[in-house]
Regions:
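Hydrophobic/aromatic residues within well-ordered alpha-helical segments
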Residues: 50, 57, 61, 65, ...
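Short secondary-structure transition hinges
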Residues: 52, 92-131
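Helix-turn-helix
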Residues: 10, 14, 18-52, 56
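N-terminal intrinsically disordered/low-complexity leader segments
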Residues: 1-6, 17
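Amphipathic alpha-helical packing segments from all-alpha helical-bundle domains
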Residues: 63-66, 114-140, 150-154, 177
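Hydrophobic alpha-helical connector segments
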Residues: 56, 70-100, 149, 153-156
């Protein structure tokens, strides 16, 4: 039996799940209504459009990643320690919010230009946290002096973003082990 849920949060959560599973174009408002136990037209009492839902899911992904970066940057310690915190925060967001993250990483390109621009700016701000920490590490001695903050951030975020494709909580690798392995891999490449 389908339980009828009708809060906006329920609608956005269901949209994130369906966008993650079927993609933006593969998800219809009818699919979403069925998921929520609503008639298609009833859905419009909660949202203006499917694009509106995509915006909410993707912007939530951006907020979650930025909050994890802000927390990491607020910690005490060397840049290497902050980088480990950035990695742990990213992994935590991916593991705790798989549907939002999958939609953020894979479906943001489906946003209209205005919203895409905002999300790109948010993504750039998040990436800047990694660049900032790597640059700090080059100057405080905890990371290689010749590290390239821009390229090394791209490399590291490529690894971190790929986790959503293969990681399964019920699999052989636990979250703590995943954080340790990615951190050691990254820091192994960046230590002096």
């Amino acid at each position: 039996m389908v339980t009828v849920r009708n809060t906006r949060k329920d609608v956005v959560t269901a949209a994130g799940r369906l966008f993650a599973e079927k993609g933006y174009h593969g998800t219809s408002m009818r699919d979403l209504g069925r998921e929520l136990g609503l008639l298609g037209s009833s859905l419009y009492a909660h949202v203006e459009s499917k694009q509106d839902l995509l915006v909410e899911v993707v912007e939530e992904g951006a907020r979650l990643f930025q909050a994890s970066a802000d927390a990491a940057l607020a910690t005490e310690g060397s840049a290497a320690s902050k980088l480990r915190q950035l990695i742990a925060g990213h992994v935590g967001v991916v593991v705790d919010n798989p549907d939002i993250v999958r939609t953020y990483l894979n479906e943001a390109r489906m946003l209209d230009p205005e919203h895409r621009g905002r999300v790109i700016a948010a993504r750039d701000g998040y990436e800047q946290a990694f660049r900032q920490v790597i640059a700090l590490g080059s100057s405080d001695g905890s990371l290689r002096p010749d590290a390239d903050p821009k390229l090394d951030s791209i490399f590291l975020l490529s690894i971190l973003n790929a986790i959503e494709r293969w990681y399964r909580p019920q699999g052989e690798v636990g979250v703590a082990e995943l954080v340790d392995e990615v951190s050691e891999f990254a820091l192994g490449a960046l230590r002096p």
